[in-house]
């Protein structure tokens, strides 16, 4: 018997799990009608032979920005085909396509130019973009998702795109930039700001009731009838509403809850599965975040994980003493205590730890903190870094010294 026969013969929960993923764009977007109409109005000159102003879309993660833009873009392409107009949309995720060269090469290749993804001078690629657009006479909407990532690493690409229309005769480009950061324009060069000529649309967070509507809509497409226990959707919506009204978080919670139920061979998705999903998502987020941290932040967290096994709360001074000793074991020079305080603030913002400033009376003030992550899970994630793997050899010694506050080897 095939090993999958038993799995496939069991009752299924999912009808189509892909509709719960971030990449899915639904046919309808509940509670974003105002933003859809606003964006459609701003892009409508494309269908009348004109060039719209550039558009910036702002809002926190999970507020429907990308889904709304892609929804309107799809409608724009459909309307242009009906009217037999030469209008195109090109989507670029600037977290992945993050250099001026790659942005321009991506655009050139979209319109038929055989530009390699590396190797040419950027100016040459820019000229190829112009030639490709002029050959086709295309009016293009360029969607730059996470545009703030591009601004930080390659703002000359944005400058090139903002000035390109003055060099085109038969075609044009409209930029639609999407960002979680409402202040990212503060980092733009003055020459880019002056050439942007942009409109802005702000996406507010969803509330619990709106998130519930979104989940109900997706659940009908994602699940077989009758597999969701009462209260599952409401709980997912309520938890996500606390996280700044994040629809992505709500959808992830519902999907992971169902996957947990599926793995447990349960025919229903229950409230208890949602609670397990919350813990799993938080752990996965923490592990992924830890993997991307610089080495000193990792050593700092390793120090905290050792102390916290017997002392859940600890101070900056206590952590710094252990941190310095670990730096010696890893073979890196320790940072100053002031810089370590900055790193602690960054870790606090990431949600890996929680810190408060407390008064020590005449001894001044210090920061008291506790880890929000399980120290064993945290240490396992940290030890994926080859530089920290050798610390396992000293774990017993380090724990003993950390817990006794005897910071000498």
Swiss-Prot record:
<feature type="binding site">
    <location>
        <position position="206"/>
    </location>
    <ligand>
        <name>ATP</name>
    </ligand>
</feature>
<dbReference type="InterPro" id="IPR027417">
    <property type="entry name" value="P-loop_NTPase"/>
</dbReference>
<dbReference type="Pfam" id="PF22703">
    <property type="entry name" value="Cdc6_lid"/>
</dbReference>
<dbReference type="Pfam" id="PF13191">
    <property type="entry name" value="AAA_16"/>
</dbReference>
<dbReference type="InterPro" id="IPR050311">
    <property type="entry name" value="ORC1/CDC6"/>
</dbReference>
<dbReference type="GO" id="GO:0005524">
    <property type="term" value="F:ATP binding"/>
</dbReference>
<feature type="binding site">
    <location>
        <begin position="63"/>
        <end position="67"/>
    </location>
    <ligand>
        <name>ATP</name>
    </ligand>
</feature>
<dbReference type="InterPro" id="IPR036388">
    <property type="entry name" value="WH-like_DNA-bd_sf"/>
</dbReference>
<comment type="function">
    <text>Involved in regulation of DNA replication.</text>
</comment>
<comment type="similarity">
    <text>Belongs to the CDC6/cdc18 family.</text>
</comment>
<dbReference type="InterPro" id="IPR041664">
    <property type="entry name" value="AAA_16"/>
</dbReference>
<dbReference type="Pfam" id="PF09079">
    <property type="entry name" value="Cdc6_C"/>
</dbReference>
<dbReference type="GO" id="GO:0016887">
    <property type="term" value="F:ATP hydrolysis activity"/>
</dbReference>
<keyword id="KW-0235">DNA replication</keyword>
<feature type="binding site">
    <location>
        <position position="218"/>
    </location>
    <ligand>
        <name>ATP</name>
    </ligand>
</feature>
<dbReference type="GO" id="GO:0006260">
    <property type="term" value="P:DNA replication"/>
</dbReference>
<dbReference type="InterPro" id="IPR003593">
    <property type="entry name" value="AAA+_ATPase"/>
</dbReference>
<dbReference type="InterPro" id="IPR015163">
    <property type="entry name" value="Cdc6_C"/>
</dbReference>
<dbReference type="InterPro" id="IPR014277">
    <property type="entry name" value="Orc1/Cdc6_arc"/>
</dbReference>
<keyword id="KW-0067">ATP-binding</keyword>
<keyword id="KW-0547">Nucleotide-binding</keyword>
<dbReference type="InterPro" id="IPR036390">
    <property type="entry name" value="WH_DNA-bd_sf"/>
</dbReference>
<dbReference type="InterPro" id="IPR055237">
    <property type="entry name" value="Cdc6_lid"/>
</dbReference>
<protein>
    <recommendedName>
        <fullName>ORC1-type DNA replication protein 1</fullName>
    </recommendedName>
</protein>
């Amino acid at each position: 018997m095939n090993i999958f026969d038993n799995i496939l013969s069991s009752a299924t929960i999912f009808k189509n799990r892909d509709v719960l993923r971030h990449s899915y764009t639904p046919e309808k977007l509940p509670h974003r009608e105002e933003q859809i109409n606003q964006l459609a109005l701003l892009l409508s000159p494309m269908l009348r032979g004109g060039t719209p102003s550039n558009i910036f879309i702002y809002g926190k993660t999970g507020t429907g920005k990308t889904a709304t833009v892609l929804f309107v873009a799809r409608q724009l392409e459909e309307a242009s085909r009906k009217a037999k107009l030469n209008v195109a949309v090109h989507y670029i995720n600037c977290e992945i396509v993050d250099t001026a060269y790659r942005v321009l090469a991506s655009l050139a290749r979209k319109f038929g130019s055989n530009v390699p993804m590396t190797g040419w001078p950027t100016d040459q690629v820019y000229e190829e973009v112009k030639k490709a657009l002029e050959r086709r006479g295309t009016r293009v909407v360029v969607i730059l998702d996470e545009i703030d990532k591009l601004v930080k690493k390659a703002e000359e690409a944005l400058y090139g795109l903002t000035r390109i229309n003055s060099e085109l005769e038969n075609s044009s480009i409209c930029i639609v930039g999407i960002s979680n950061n409402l202040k990212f324009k503060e980092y733009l060069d003055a020459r880019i700001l002056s050439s942007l000529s942009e409109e802005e649309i702000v996406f507010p967070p969803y509330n619990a009731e709106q998130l519930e509507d979104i989940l109900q809509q997706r659940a009908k497409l994602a699940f077989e009838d009758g597999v969701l226990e009462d209260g599952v959707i409401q709980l997912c919506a309520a938890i996500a509403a606390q996280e700044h009204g994040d629809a992505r978080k709500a959808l992830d919670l519902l999907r992971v809850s169902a996957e947990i139920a599926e793995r447990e061979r349960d025919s229903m998705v229950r409230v208890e599965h949602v609670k397990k999903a919350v813990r799993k998502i938080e752990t996965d987020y923490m592990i992924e975040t830890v993997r991307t941290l610089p080495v000193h932040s990792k050593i700092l967290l390793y120090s905290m994980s050792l102390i916290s096994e017997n002392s859940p709360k600890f101070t900056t001074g206590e952590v710094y003493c252990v941190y310095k000793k670990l730096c010696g074991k890893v073979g890196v020079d320790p940072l100053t205590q002031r810089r370590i305080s900055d790193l602690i603030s960054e870790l606090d913002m990431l949600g890996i730890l929680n810190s408060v400033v407390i008064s020590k009376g005449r001894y001044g003030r210090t920061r008291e903190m506790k880890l929000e992550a399980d120290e064993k899970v945290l240490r396992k994630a940290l030890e994926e870094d080859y530089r920290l793997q050798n610390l396992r050899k000293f774990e017993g010694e380090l724990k003993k010294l950390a817990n006794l506050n005897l910071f000498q080897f």
